[in-house]
């Protein structure tokens, strides 16, 4: 296990942070593809369209081309989902990380370094909702490089956010993560985050039945002592 050090973000980290974030999101493309492939409506298309074409034309070549087209379309949709998410983040809060996360005492962005390389990242900022009865901090952009998984780095990054929230007087830490991010969900729930609901942010996510899972960690809960 290589040693790592968690510290606050610096402007010189921007390129390595973006690369880590992009690679982390691209890892979810195969899982998204498999999820869409196994949906009942997809299986129906994979059976129905080629069969209809064969009965109409008698051409096995046309059947193979139709199956290939369906597979490529599913892969494109899976790839598009995560590429769109990356571009959206890079043009909003991650366009200027220093301004978004480092210009206020109530928000922060951390990186994990190992042997001079950026191997982890996580961010946090307050939830701005005047209707909230509790002061909430939102955890965002948790990512750990593939080579440093299963070393406890993900948990250490989350604990960093929880400790920061506690010091800043927040009552809860909240986050949203895709149901397709299986490892992240297991990590959060294993650390005491509780599911509070599901949200479909796009028509495509509703179509493929892959909601965002909303989670909450109460800093007044029994788990607080584990920080």
From Swiss-Prot:
Coiled coil: none annotated. It is a multi-pass membrane protein. Gene3D superfamilies: 3.40.630.30. Residues 61-220 form the N-acetyltransferase domain. InterPro entries: Acyl_CoA_acyltransferase, GNAT_dom, NAT_camello-type. Keywords: Acyltransferase, Membrane, Transferase, Transmembrane, Transmembrane helix. The chain crosses the membrane at residues 36-56, 58-78. GO terms for molecular function: histone H4 acetyltransferase activity. It is found in: Membrane. GO terms for cellular component: nuclear membrane; nucleus. It catalyses: L-lysyl-[protein] + acetyl-CoA = N(6)-acetyl-L-lysyl-[protein] + CoA + H(+). Its EC number is 2.3.1.48. Pfam families: Acetyltransf_1 (PF00583). PROSITE patterns: GNAT (PS51186). SUPFAM superfamilies: Acyl-CoA N-acyltransferases (Nat). Its main location: membrane. Has histone acetyltransferase activity in vitro, with specificity for histone H4. Belongs to the camello family. This is N-acetyltransferase family 8 member 7. It comes from Mus musculus. The gene is Nat8f7.
């Amino acid at each position: 296990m290589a040693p790592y050090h968690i510290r606050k973000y610096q402007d010189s980290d921007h390129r390595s942070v973006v690369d880590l974030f992009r690679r982390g999101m691209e890892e979810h493309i195969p899982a998204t593809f498999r999820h869409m492939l196994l949906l009942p409506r997809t299986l129906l298309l994979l059976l129905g369209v080629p069969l209809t074409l064969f009965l109409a034309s008698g051409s096995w070549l046309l059947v193979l081309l139709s199956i290939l087209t369906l597979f490529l379309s599913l892969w494109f949709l899976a790839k598009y989902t995560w590429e769109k998410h990356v571009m959206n983040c890079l043009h909003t809060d991650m366009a200027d990380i220093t301004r978004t996360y480092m210009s206020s005492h109530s928000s922060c962005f951390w990186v994990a370094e190992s042997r001079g390389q950026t191997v982890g990242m996580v961010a946090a900022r307050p939830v701005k909702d005047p209707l909230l009865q509790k002061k909430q901090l939102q955890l965002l952009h948790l990512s750990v490089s593939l080579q440093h998984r299963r070393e406890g780095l993900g948990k250490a990054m989350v604990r960093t956010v929880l400790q920061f929230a506690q010091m800043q007087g927040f009552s809860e830490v909240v986050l949203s993560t895709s149901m397709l991010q299986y490892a992240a969900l297991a990590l959060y729930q294993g650390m005491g985050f509780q599911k509070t609901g599901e949200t479909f942010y796009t028509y495509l996510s509703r179509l493929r039945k892959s909601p965002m899972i909303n989670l909450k960690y109460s800093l007044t809960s029994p788990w607080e002592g584990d920080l």
